[in-house]
Amino acid sequence: MQRHKVEIGSPDGSPGIKRSDSLDPIANTTILSVPQRPSSPRQFFERLYGHLETRSSENGEIDVGTHAHKPPPCDTPYHSDGGSVSSPDISISDERTSLAAYPAYDFYGHAKDYPQHPSQQHQQHHHHHHHPPQLVHQKLSYVSPPPAIAAGGAANPVLPHAFPAGFPSDPHFSAGFSAFLARRRRKEGRQRRQRTTFSTEQTLRLEVEFHRNEYISRSRRFELAETLRLTETQIKIWFQNRRAKDKRIEKAQIDQHYRNFVVANGFMSSIMGQAATTMPPGGVTGGVAVGVGLNYYAAAATPAALPKDNTQDANFIDIDDQFQRQQQQKQQQQQQQQRRRETTTPINIC
């Protein structure tokens, strides 16, 4: 195995670079000792994690390389044995060289095994000085996702490239969306429970039992199941649904009564406002007292002037009229009884 030793001296008299290269790419080690000024934290992290980043070119190819960002130029130019090739834009550090040997991992812990072009594999077995520094970036041979994903189907929804271009690349979003798709597939594959259809006879019998008692006992439930050819669970669920329906109907009726009361109160307030403007200064003559709730208002109007419809104020007026008529009838009856007592004379028995 032939080994080459290269000593590079800097023009300012600083220590040179001792480099030992071999033709074997596995045994090839690069040892550089270049005095550099302290780097910033951003440049430090670029050296550590620069090989994990991907960059898409304009033609749709993905460039994956050990140098995602250009490091600061080195003071000492790079010379090779094969020719005078110098590039001040390329600087190799120990951290970048050591980390480039490890494969890249995605956020799921899977190693990214990128296929390489045969020409690139052939280039890796040659020495570095046979190629210019522009071959640092490796272009992947495959650009688009697998055919199943390109056709619109998600062959593996866990991978980030399976999502459309509009979705964010957040790992938490990808994991949550994958779980959502899994739950949806399980739900679609599961057979839905058939809804029980009750006949007219069964419904009438159950309605009769519900009107007798809203909560059915276990013994009675067993008897109904035998009679109607149903299961006890079906009867139990029917009673639960019927009670819920009753509560909904009752709540709707209460809401309707409340709305009617609000409408009637607003209508009577408008009538009282009109009556206050037309009321004579001496007071109310010939008016009637109209009650709304517990408050009574004097209105300069007759009952015939108010609308006789299904509103609540009309019902109050009807109740007041009936009460007055009953009072008048009682007074007339009392007067008739007194007259009868006065006309009748006692019979003297001798």
Curated annotation (Swiss-Prot):
Listed Basic residues bias regions: 123-132
Principal place of residence: nucleus
Family matches, as PROSITE patterns: HOMEOBOX_1 (PS00027), HOMEOBOX_2 (PS50071)
UniProt subcellular location: Nucleus
Superkingdom of the source species: Eukaryota
A cellular component annotation (GO) from this entry: nucleus
SUPFAM superfamilies linked to this entry: Homeodomain-like (SSF46689)
Gene Ontology BP term (one): positive regulation of transcription by RNA polymerase II
Alphabetically ordered keywords of this record: Developmental protein, DNA-binding, Homeobox, Nucleus, Sensory transduction, Transcription, Transcription regulation, Vision
Annotated Gene3D superfamilies: Homeodomain-like
Region (Disordered): 1-23, 70-91, 111-137, 324-350
DNA-binding region: 191-250
Annotated disulfide bonds: none
Annotated Pfam families: Homeodomain
Biased composition (Low complexity): 324-337
UniProt note on tissues of expression: Expressed in cells within, and posterior to, the morphogenetic furrow of the eye imaginal disk, expression is rapidly restricted to the R2, R3, R4, and R5 precursor cells.
Disruption outcome: R2 and R5 fail to be correctly determined and appear to be transformed into cells of the R3/4/1/6 subtype.
Any one GO MF annotation of this record: DNA-binding transcription factor activity, RNA polymerase II-specific
Role this protein plays: Required to establish the unique cell identity of photoreceptors R2 and R5 and consequently for ommatidial assembly in the developing eye imaginal disk. Repression of expression in R8 photoreceptor by senseless (sens) is an essential mechanism of R8 cell fate determination.
PANTHER family referenced in this protein's UniProt entry, alphabetically: HOMEOBOX PROTEIN ROUGH-RELATED
Name listed for the protein in its UniProt record: Homeobox protein rough
Organism of provenance: Drosophila melanogaster
Gene behind the chain: ro
